[in-house]
Structures are given as C-alpha cells and as structure tokens.
Swiss-Prot record:
The complex is composed of two ATP-binding proteins (PstB), two transmembrane proteins (PstC and PstA) and a solute-binding protein (PstS). It is an enzyme of class 7 (translocase). Keywords: ATP-binding, Cell inner membrane, Cell membrane, Membrane, Nucleotide-binding, Phosphate transport, Translocase, Transport. This is Phosphate import ATP-binding protein PstB. The keyword Metal-binding does not apply. Its EC number is 7.3.2.1. It is a peripheral membrane protein. It comes from the Bacteria. CDD domains: ABC_PstB_phosphate_transporter (cd03260). GO terms for molecular function: ATP binding; ATP hydrolysis activity; ATPase-coupled phosphate ion transmembrane transporter activity. Part of the ABC transporter complex PstSACB involved in phosphate import. Responsible for energy coupling to the transport system. It is found in: Cell inner membrane.
Amino acid sequence: MSELSVSMSAAGGLPQAPLLPEAPAKVTVRNLNFYYGEHHALKNINLTLGTNRVTAFIGPSGCGKSTLLRIFNRMYDLYPGQRATGQLMLDQTNILDGKLDLNLLRARVGMVFQKPTPFPMTIYENIAFGIRLYEKISKSEMDDRVEKALRGGALWNEVKDKLNASGLSLSGGQQQRLCIARTVAVRPEVILFDEPCSALDPISTAKVEELIQELSENYTIAIVTHNMQQAARVSDKTAFMYLGELIEFDDTSKIFTSPSDRRTQDYITGRFG
C-alpha cells in the first residue's frame, strides 16, 4: 500500500485506504482464548492476518487488543501464570507449540513497542546486535545489512554520517524509526506495532505511518492504535475488540462506513471508549 488514496467516510469523516483484494493467510487465529491466572482475558478469537496486509486493532483500553498482539510472538511466556489455548498458526507453524524455539519465532515475528526502546549503544550496533544473534556474516556484509535496515526504517539519510553516535542521542521519532529498522534487520515475516506513535509528535507520526505503508509491501503488519484516523489511514483490515471479545473484523472501509455491530459504530463515532 505505497500510495494512499483517500475518501471521506460517513462515520466521522475519516480518510479511507483503498480496498485491496483478499490476500493469502499469513497468521490464522482459531478459537483463541487467553488467561491471566484465572481471569479469562480473551474469548474465542477468530481472525486471519493476510500476507502483506496491514490489520489494525481498535477498541477501548483494557479490551484485549495489546494482549492479543503479544500472543502472536509469545511475549506472555515472560510472565508466569499466563496461558493461551486454541490454534494460532504462522503459515504451517503452530505458535502455541510448547516446544517452539521462541528466539526463532521472535525473529519471524518482530515487535515495535509504544515507547521507543533503543539499546544504549551506537546506531550501528543497535542494528547489528540482532543480526549477530542469528547469523555470522562478514564486516562488509554487516555494513550492507545495517544500511539496508536503516533505509528500511526511513532513517539512513539522517544518520549515515553518525553511525557511531549513540542511539539515545536521536529524537523520539528517530528512535522509533531506529527500533523499526532494528526489527527489519533480522528479516521478519510479520511486524507487530503496539501504539507506535502514541509518544510522538504529529510530524514524526506521519513519517511512521508512511513507513508502515511502505513496509506492508514486504511484511505482514498488525497495529494496535487508539487513533481512529490512524487506523483508517494505514490499514486494510480492522478488528474492533471489546471486553476481551472480537466484536467485528472486516475491511477497514466497511468498518468505518457501515459497521455491522452497533457497538463498533458507537466506538468509532466517540459515543464510548
């Protein structure tokens, strides 16, 4: 989705991304349930993330959208007492398989968090660090990979003359794009974005949104956002969640113009949430 042609929806005047044909499934979710101890946080979730498509997850705080995102790369394994049941497939790989190598899973399914999290090291090493975890390559190959990753993060032209500067010296927007470049560097298949622009100014937000659209040419993307305009601008599909349930999942254009469920309509028009 490299170009964004927009029309205005009847539901709040939101700009709409163009409708694309259905894509082959990259991630398939069937009857997924998730528990924090005895608390049933997600209930019978069923959806599909299309290959090289952007799927937005919207809903009020606490509805389960960020929880769902973290199941896609098993981040919940870091916390005792949390468990998922059901089926969650990445192509032919069962993400919920207890024997799955989580390091390899997280190379295939990368994640960009709400707050930029650059490592306390140089810009170059921020990118090279992850590559070294999975590959042994020459210095010249590493230089090439670092450049490609920074270009993929739309950051190369801004940092090419200061690769030895600390990643922490960059602005907030640049730090977030560095984190995106770091994720791209290990060549994932899926990239998860959890409120990636919530801490950024409007100019930096626009750059990240444009970057997400460019990345969708090569990656399958899932993004959690509270910003309805952002969901409408960048996504092909939108999932509306409420109280741990998936209420509606459809083309973004339909969700924002003629949702099937009244709760979806009420949320996107600001009646609650």
